[in-house]
Amino acid sequence: MSDTPSSPFIEHPETPRKALFSSNRPSPVRSTHATPSLHGTPSTASRFSRTPREDVIGLKKTISQLRYDLEALKQEQQVAQILQEEKERELEAKHKKELDRAEQAESDQVFLFNKQKELSDENRTLKEELRSLQSQHEADGRELNHELEGLKDLLNDLQSENRALVSEMNYKIEDYEHRIKAASTTTDDLLKEVENRGTALTEAKMNVVKFEQLVESLKGESLDLKQSAKDLEAVEQTKSQLSDQIKYSRELEAKVSALTVRVEAAESAQQLSQVYEEDLSSMKGKLKNMEGLRQQLAEQQLQILVHEENSAKWKAYLEKSDEFKTVEEVVTALNKARMEKASLLERAGSGVNDETRSTAEAYARLQERVTTLESELQLAQNQLKTEKKKVATSIRQHTLAANEAKFLREQLKAYDDEEVTAAGADVKQGRIDELEKLLEAVKNEKSVLEGELKEARSEQGCTVAAGTKRPRADDSVSSEVISEYTRKLQTLQQEFDEVSVEARLLAKTKEALEARLESLEKSQESRVRILELRENPTSRHEAVKQSMLDTLKAENEALMGKNENSKSVPQASLERKQLELQGVRDKLASTEKSYQRLKEVFSVKSLEFREAVYALTGYQIDILRNKKVKVTSMYAQSDEDSFTFLPDPNHKGQFAGVIDSPLTDEFSNIVDYWVKDKKDFPCFLAALNLELYERKENNGNQAS
């Protein structure tokens, strides 16, 4: 029985069986004498030394001991069986729990996969919504930019109104002049009053001196009158009179001091008025000088235009001519031709003698005829030039009038569109009348020019007809005279050839002038766009207003520079600055109001966005200083359990790591794996949420 193996499920070593079979425990049937062993044959000495009764008693004891051991073994076996069954039940429960946990983990994995898929879909939708919000914000930004442009336009309108207000400075200057005159008159009155008050003051001082003498005399008398009680009333009266006189003298001194202050103010005002008058006179002189300079500038511009036209004429002529390249060549050729002509005339004159006086007379007649023809040709060319100029001017004026009429129609249409007030009808009617008068004047000028052109053409026809008449030939000329005539005719033919050359040159100049005229007409039609008359009343009025505005600005700057040291400012400047300040305040209030509205809308939208992010991702995101981001999970035990991410300075919109905290030490394995090794912050946040969720669930199960 000692070889029976012990049960493996018995966890406590101190069992009854082990205590029973321990070698140190003495046997209950062992005596001082030797007893037979259970496993061996007793010796002969021991067997013969004991009696049968003792053997029976010993056997009984061993039997009882064995029964006791058997009962103990049975109990031990029952306890071991109970423990084994309990252990088996615990193992089955643990195995079942592990199976449940594995199934739960499997279901959790499926749930997390589905959840991650849903989160990715929601993240995608959030990104799309974020893009739509960004586009909406961009649209709002564009609308705000449009509003800002509108505000800028409003500011420009206000500035134009401010310029209009500056035009009122002229009236205020006149007001200042009247005020200066009034101030000068008031200063004169004040000076007179000061003189009167000064005389009154001297008289008052004399009276004070007299009263002081009287007081001293009365004091002496009072010493005498102290002994008599009857004169006390007289003394009191004198004292009251003295006090009244002193009060009156003090009042006079106060009035004199006030008058001195007023006199000083009047003197300063008079000085200012003198300064203003000097400035006005200097400004008027400058304005007159400016008018003279403008006239000189206009004359210089006209001279420049004339020189440009002459240079253009020479340029067009030289482009058509193949012989001449510069104006100097043309002048030298002309002088050469004149010299040749003079030499020919001298040679022709030297060949005439007394015998051929009649031939000379005929030659003279022919020469006169040639000269008349040349003069007529020159006159015709001049008339042709003047006619062309008149035609060009009439065409120009006609185009100007047509364009002006077109522009005026458009301007009238614009006036009809912009007419708002009742007074606009009268102004428009006045403008229409002025423009109609101007159009009639242009038409009359056109008709006059056409009449002059017709008269010039008729005169040219008459002169040509008169010049073509030939003198009748003399029948009494002899044959020698005829031969002489033939020689002279040859010379005249040569001269005629030369004249024909000049005529061809003139024809070339005519062609060049016509080409230049065509080019000018084309350039005039293509480049020039006439919007108004040269002497437009509106532009003239605007120029006058602009010049007045410039002078007023200069005067205002000069006056402001002179009044910098004084504490007072002009009333007009103060009112203008107050109006500008009020406009700026209104603009600032409107911008602050719009900014406050945008701020409220942005706060509401940002709160909605944060709530949506918190509901979808499980994290509350807070933006800290220096572009740090604080992230707190919804499964955290407290608000202090959060992570703070550091921004990456090299990459915009990315993070470099996590700031060390007790929570990072607690989840160091997740931080090391996802943040330090993988650099994947979304997976880190997802793993952290899962870990916190499992911890929260385990704490809830343990609490339940």
UniProtKB/Swiss-Prot annotation:
A GO cellular-component term linked to this record: mitotic spindle
Span list, region Disordered: 1-53
Subcellular localization: Nucleus
Claim: Nucleus is one of the keywords in the record: yes
Keywords: Cell cycle, Cell division, Coiled coil, Mitosis, Nucleus
Chief localisation class: nucleus
Biased composition (Polar residues): 21-49
Keyword Nuclease in annotation: no
GO biological process terms held by the UniProt record: attachment of mitotic spindle microtubules to kinetochore; cell division; mitotic spindle assembly checkpoint signaling
Domain of life of the organism encoding this protein: Eukaryota
Residue runs in coiled coils: 53-603
InterPro entries according to UniProt: Mad1 (IPR008672)
Role according to the record: Central component of the spindle assembly checkpoint.
Record-stated family: Belongs to the MAD1 family.
Protein name: Spindle assembly checkpoint component MAD1
Organism lineage: Eukaryota, Fungi, Dikarya, Ascomycota, Saccharomycotina
